[in-house]
Amino acid sequence: MKTKLLLSLLGLFLITACSKSADELIELSSENLKNEKTDQAIKDLETLLTKYPEDSLASKAQYKLASIHLNWKNDLTKGYTSLQNTVSHYGRSIQGTQAQKEIDQFPEYILNKAESLRKRKMVKEAVEHLMYMIEKYSQHELTPKSQYMLGDLYMNEFRDFPTAI
């Protein structure tokens, strides 16, 4: 009986000692980003949000998650969802306020990002961004510009004249 109790306490101690704090997880995610390990950085931030959702660093982690999805992974869907989560869970924080501004300006962001991707010869990603813009914001005032840019990409980058028209 004493052995079971001792083993249980030892196991609990090891689990507690091995788990990382919110500060450590934020630092790990930053290090992983510096080392271009974006998937591990995402896991670190998701762990922080799961284990410490009420921590003062949680809003920063949620916003940083959006930034990684949008800027490193070029994943508009996950990035937008992360921005929405930042607003819904941490709306009164600095990050929540900034996330709301970015949501409000998301169509402009998409168009600017598509132009940037094209200049960096990341044509496939630029096309994906423009298609997302056209599908999700069909009534937005910038959608015709997105359609024009998409046609221009097909015409000049892919030399696919039928698709461009």
Go through the PLM ranges and name each one.
Residues L5-L6, I15-I165:
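Acidic, polar-rich low-complexity tracts and alpha-helical solenoid repeat scaffolds
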Residues M1-K2:
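N-terminal secretory signal peptides that target proteins for export/translocation
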